């Protein structure tokens, strides 16, 4: 790696640490020529392939901006959105793919958003899945109710098992 100060083509790694979220490695380097230290951050690349076929780097900011409109007027904080974007990125990276279709990013948003806020989920899903009628909304609401019933049944069963 070139030294940013003297452009010497070599450097020595002095220290390496994994970032807090585990998505990157921070390295302290020292140039053997000028002996100055600098920091580099290494991440794996994740490319989103848009409908047009053009690829662009994955952006948590784009995920947050896309979900923010669905969350307007809801009790969802900026921190909640940041956590959601991180969860979406982690889920996508866990698939092991270096490239992912934009459509798949939208699908990866739906699960964490549903856990965060059901109304925001319905708003996002209505646009993302192109709801065309009231029946589409009713169907999505029925699925949410069914899942809530299943979750409630599981919680009841846990409470009954405990002495």
UniProtKB/Swiss-Prot annotation:
Keywords, sorted A to Z: ATP-binding, DNA-binding, Metal-binding, Nucleotide-binding, Repressor, Transcription, Transcription regulation, Zinc, Zinc-finger
Cofactor: Zn(2+)
Top-rank taxon, per record: Bacteria
Residue ranges of every copy of the ATP-cone domain listed in the record: 46-136
Cofactor comment text: Binds 1 zinc ion.
GO molecular function annotations of the record: ATP binding; DNA binding; zinc ion binding
Zinc fingers classed as unnamed: ranges: 3-34
Gene Ontology biological-process entries: negative regulation of DNA-templated transcription
PANTHER family: TRANSCRIPTIONAL REPRESSOR NRDR
Known role: Negatively regulates transcription of bacterial ribonucleotide reductase nrd genes and operons by binding to NrdR-boxes.
Family, similarity comment: Belongs to the NrdR family.
Protein's name according to its UniProt entry: Transcriptional repressor NrdR
Species this chain originates from: Renibacterium salmoninarum (strain ATCC 33209 / DSM 20767 / JCM 11484 / NBRC 15589 / NCIMB 2235)
């Amino acid at each position: 790696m070139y030294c940013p100060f003297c452009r010497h083509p070599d450097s020595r790694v002095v220290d390496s640490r994994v970032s807090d979220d585990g998505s990157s490695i921070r390295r302290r380097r020292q140039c053997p020529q000028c002996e100055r230290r600098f920091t580099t951050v290494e991440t794996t690349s994740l490319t989103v392939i848009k409908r047009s076929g053009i690829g662009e780097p994955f952006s948590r900011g784009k995920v947050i901006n896309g979900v923010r409109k669905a969350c307007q007027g809801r009790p969802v904080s900026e921190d909640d959105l940041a956590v959601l974007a991180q969860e979406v990125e982690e889920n996508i990276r866990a698939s092991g793919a270096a490239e992912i279709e934009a459509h798949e990013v939208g699908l990866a948003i739906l699960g964490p958003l549903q856990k965060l806020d059901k109304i925001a989920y319905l708003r996002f899903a209505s646009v993302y899945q192109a709801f065309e009628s009231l029946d589409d909304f009713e169907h999505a609401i029925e699925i949410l109710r069914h899942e809530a019933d299943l979750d409630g049944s599981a919680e009841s069963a846990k409470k009954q098992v405990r002495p």
